[in-house]
């Protein structure tokens, strides 16, 4: 059996996040909107690639988003989505 057939376990550090993820995402979203970008596309591009060039320097958005690890951002997005939609799945 190849390693591609095995499920890998991903463990997230349970350290408290010193930066508020929601606050960062909202600030970055607003900065992207102000610059005329599609905020969702740009944030997804950043999350998938890790390339900060997807996020403008406008309003320090690039600096803000880089204060968080991408896995922390993704974890918060998944938690938020599931907490809002879980009842509709049951």
Curated annotation (Swiss-Prot):
Pfam families: IreB (PF06135). InterPro entries: IreB (IPR009309). Belongs to the UPF0297 family. HAMAP family: UPF0297. This is UPF0297 protein BH1268. It comes from Halalkalibacterium halodurans (strain ATCC BAA-125 / DSM 18197 / FERM 7344 / JCM 9153 / C-125) (Bacillus halodurans).
